[in-house]
Amino acid sequence: MKIILFGPPGVGKGTQAKILSEKHQLAHISTGDMLRSAIKQGTELGLKAKSFIDKGELVPDDVIIGMIEEYVSVQENREQGFILDGFPRTVPQAEALDRLLQKYEIPIDCVISLTADAEEIVARLSGRRIAPSTGKVYHVVYNPPKVEGKCDETGEDLIIREDDKEETIRKRLSIYDQTTAPVLDYYKKKGTAAEVDGTQSIDKVSKEIDEILTSATK
């Protein structure tokens, strides 16, 4: 089974990818993790990616595609199946990915887009608070500390990460709408895309995804 999973930041993509990976024994391919691993290992593509990151530039599509190709070119990896998370983010990336998968005769079984209202995502993410020394995550509504603004374990002041500030979240959502949302239309035209409401409970979202996959792989 080969799945592409995407959706805006804060929609619960990582959680669902982990559930799918464990339930169906699929590899979870996160392009972000791939990049970090390649840079850490000092591979040719990793060094190339680092040169762009160090200049504050986006890593070019051909570098990301190259990393995905390194993975899918291994027959065992193709046979296991995978969930592609965080890629493609633009239509040109989707087209490049199509060419790569056609080269290795890999059909995508399903493209799942998790959706959520912008205000729901802002509420989810802007409510997060972090304990600086341990990285423990709290939420002012869903998982509040016993004492407001203080870590239960260390007593230190909780902080708001830059990524969790409302202005940053809205900017990320705007970028997503402009670049990634058209990717859903691209896959809809191919008849492989399905949308799932990501604001439901984790179990409900997981159940809906399973129903879609069962139908797609009949």
UniProtKB/Swiss-Prot annotation:
* CDD domains for the chain: ADK
| Record's catalysed reaction(s) | AMP + ATP = 2 ADP
- Which InterPro entries does the entry mention? Adenyl_kin_sub, Adenylat/UMP-CMP_kin, Adenylat_kinase_CS, Adenylate_kinase_lid-dom, P-loop_NTPase
* Key words of the record: ATP-binding, Cytoplasm, Kinase, Nucleotide biosynthesis, Nucleotide-binding, Transferase
* Gene Ontology biological-process entries: AMP salvage
- Annotated region NMP: where? 30-59
One GO MF term attached to the UniProt entry: adenylate kinase activity
Pathway involvement of the protein, from the record: Purine metabolism; AMP biosynthesis via salvage pathway; AMP from ADP: step 1/1
Please give the residue ranges the record annotates as the region LID: 127-164
Q: Tell me which PROSITE patterns the record gives.
A: ADENYLATE_KINASE
Return the Pfam families for the record. Answer: ADK, ADK_lid
- The entry marks the following residues as binding ATP, namely 10-15, 128, 137-138, 200
Q: Name one GO cellular component term.
A: cytoplasm
Q: What is its main location?
A: cytoplasm
Q: State its location(s).
A: Cytoplasm
Q: EC number(s) of the enzyme?
A: 2.7.4.3
Q: Which parts of the sequence bind AMP?
A: 31, 36, 57-59, 86-89, 93, 161, 172
Subunit comment: Monomer.
Written domain comment of the UniProt record = Consists of three domains, a large central CORE domain and two small peripheral domains, NMPbind and LID, which undergo movements during catalysis. The LID domain closes over the site of phosphoryl transfer upon ATP binding. Assembling and dissambling the active center during each catalytic cycle provides an effective means to prevent ATP hydrolysis.
Q: Main role?
A: Catalyzes the reversible transfer of the terminal phosphate group between ATP and AMP. Plays an important role in cellular energy homeostasis and in adenine nucleotide metabolism.
The family classification in the record reads: Belongs to the adenylate kinase family.
What name goes with this protein?
A: Adenylate kinase
This chain is encoded by the gene named adk
